[in-house]
Amino acid sequence: MQRKQFLTTILGGIPLLTFANFDDETTSTRKPFTVKGGKGRYGEDIKFLGVHPNNTKISGKDTNQQLSVFEYIGLGKVGPNLHMHLHQDEVFYVIEGEYRFVVGDETHRLKAGDTIFLPRMIAHTWIQLTDYGKLIYFLQPAGKMEEFFQKMNSLTERPSDEEIKRINLEHGIVNMGPP
């Protein structure tokens, strides 16, 4: 009778293995940390288009490349070119301001408190509609977005369109041009 109970317990637990995480987590940060508002993880200050703070809050290095989190502070009515991520999903949460997102053939208008999910492999862009705005956004998995932002931030001159496409592709992004 004990053997039957043992087998029932073991076999009954097998479906629970689907929820187990077998990833090697040895490279993840194992201690809590905070990043102050307006600051980037590791003290790095990244700017979008050389002006708008776009700082890493949680690095892919912290999560074994499973997730990265960024804070964007928009100081004007701008946004990225139409593009597509080959390997990452994105989630945007609007803290302040108003934004228009175009995802595939759908258009969404978001304001403070709204969230949007952008699946990988679907072309998308957004533009800030107010003079000031703030977003928190997540990429899953982290991929090479931090490196992409660092590379773009380090450029001293505006690169050619071909150079922009090459840099994007090196980081898992297909640049499709203006919105």
Where are these regions (language model features)?
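A short glycine-rich, His/Asp/Glu-containing loop-to-beta-strand
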Residues: 46-82
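Ligand-binding loop in jelly-roll beta-barrel domains
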Residues: 120-146
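Short, conserved beta-strand element in jelly-roll/cupin
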Residues: 73, 86-101
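Short acidic-glycine-tyrosine-enriched beta hairpin
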Residues: 106-120
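N-terminal export signals
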Residues: 2-25
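Acidic/histidine-enriched, glycine/proline-rich intrinsically disordered or flexible terminal extensions
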Residues: 151-179
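Histidine-centered catalytic micro-motifs
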Residues: 81-87, 125
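C-terminal segment of N-terminal export signals and the immediately downstream linker at the start
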Residues: 20-51, 154
